[in-house]
């Protein structure tokens, strides 16, 4: 059953007294020795990688499980994203409905249903709506408002020894802010992928495309008549194959092609090929390859070569040493860059960026007496990377950034009743130094989480997230602070009727600490969601 971030702090404290998205993240696991999967060229640049702590009751995860994605600026409390109805495989239910509300206006509605659900066919539809409204803590009490929704359809069809995956969605959103007035967006996506096995060869072929339209808007505080409509059109294809050489090794190749056409801008493209060799032994798994990208259209160097290397050494079940180096070109779709905040306007095409190298080395120790520990060091360089910029008509600007980043993680679990985890990450931060996926140029990121399960069906948690040294680049090459994020949140959920009805609530930014998302756009104060989930 899908877990929720839940009950208001007062309710949580009352419960604990009687008995004794946190930011959402998405984990994408790619095992190149089984199902090769190239990095998505349209990957949201507004997300930053975050180390996932090993679960204390399990062996150390494979290298692909060490990274997840979490949001930089949690402006509101969205429900879990709907792409597939969030039902456990063992559930006899075929649909769900989530509804959450928090005054004065934070609203979340999520629903999904599996129309067909058998061994060969799974056809699902789902939808989601998120909305919020709040006033900035300034002299004018500026109003910030957002409403957005999407509907999805997903098909997973087994055909022979292969699978056909088809996805379609439509989306709409609109926002208003004091800094950027208002803008609306409408768009849709269609993709299909086929993967199958033929003898010793496993292969995959896919196509995808989307269209997004952004309406006219006028920057606040300017005399401009307004910027005209802008449309993003994108298409792509990818293919991959891997062949087994012997019991321990495989060889493979991945091919991708993406293009992006934006109104009044040159059509851009990236064509890439990634050959690699993968090897698995008793205590070691790894692969060695290179991503060779050719850019089409637009200025700049068109040919780039980046490493595609990963390895994990596990001499025992309590220790793992891992290494990863990657990179490549990517197209900057407006939809992905607005993941930083939906209040960011779309004005012009954002071009193409390149990551020559993003390398990480680290280790994990544990679980030892239910305690796990990890550490890593990383270095990365990015060119023409779109970073927030303090100008009303240019909210993003291409920049070349490099940075060294290091972090520590720790976790402890006592049976199934108590789990505690913490992390601390630090990176170089200045006008020219920044971790490229931290668009707020933070210099420190600290987080902690406490989970308690005192009764069957009752889950309580508390979280703290800190992002320090946040800043934005200004005209003239200097930076201005955006304010530190200090976010304390708490919640709980309770299964009123097992596998049928849950109630949940969550509160975020309990201390109501404000900070800037962009120049002139302030975060929301105390907020959350109170609601329920119904399975049917």
Q: What kind of region is each of these model predictions?
A:
Residues 111-115, 151-157, 188-196, 237-243, ...:
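Residues on the lipid-exposed face of transmembrane beta-strands in outer-membrane beta-barrel proteins
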Residues 91-93, 105-107, 145-149, 182-188, ...:
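Residues that define the transmembrane beta-barrel architecture of outer-membrane proteins
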Residues 335-352, 381-402, 427-449, 461-495, ...:
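Outer-membrane beta-barrel domain signature, especially the mid-to-C-terminal portions
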Residues 132-152, 167-202, 208-234:
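Flexible loop and strand-edge segments within Gram-negative outer membrane beta-barrel domains
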Residues 101-103, 129-133, 159, 170-176, ...:
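Transmembrane beta-strands of outer-membrane beta-barrel pores
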